């Protein structure tokens, strides 16, 4: 046989499996909630709102809840920043809607489903009407923990 006939091009092939697992994940960014300034003669309900930014894997259901060291589920307490332990604390609550239908507590909260993009959710803080009547002058604050379960 001529040498040119033996040097023919040859090929081989194989199948390669490629895989990827996308796991569910979420991130949460919270902004501060500020009730602003009010006199102790404020007789109407006080509302303030803020946003939280949530990013969850597309199709991932999540629940946003809130807890505090105050020990009560759903009622949080603004405490004097000057450390006066004898001063009145001011009760407040957190809601997922302006109409106050969905309260955010340690066991119940805002339910939604992630879409893979940032979802801005508005939260509403509420102080009941007349709650400042016996409050001492000063700055009050509270720290709560927002938890995203998914």
Positions of the model-derived regions?
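Short acidic/polar mixed-charge low-complexity motifs
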Residues: 60, 86-88, 100
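Extracellular/luminal ectodomains and secreted, surface-exposed scaffolds of diverse proteins
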Residues: 76-77, 88-94, 102
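Surface-exposed loop/edge segments in extracytoplasmic proteins
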Residues: 100-106
């Amino acid at each position: 046989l001529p040498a040119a006939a033996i040097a023919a091009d040859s090929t081989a092939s194989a199948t390669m499996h490629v895989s990827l697992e996308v796991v569910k994940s979420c991130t949460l960014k919270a902004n501060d909630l500020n009730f602003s300034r009010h006199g102790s003669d404020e007789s109407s309900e006080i509302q303030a709102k803020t946003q939280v930014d949530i990013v969850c894997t597309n199709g991932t259901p999540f629940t946003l809840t809130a807890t505090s060291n105050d020990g009560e589920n759903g009622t949080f307490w603004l405490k004097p920043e000057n450390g006066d332990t004898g001063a009145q604390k001011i009760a407040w609550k957190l809601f997922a809607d302006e109409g106050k239908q969905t309260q955010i507590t340690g066991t119940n909260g805002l339910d939604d489903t992630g879409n893979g993009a940032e979802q801005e959710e508005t939260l509403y803080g509420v102080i009941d009407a007349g709650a400042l009547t016996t409050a001492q002058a000063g700055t009050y604050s509270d720290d709560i923990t927002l938890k995203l379960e998914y």
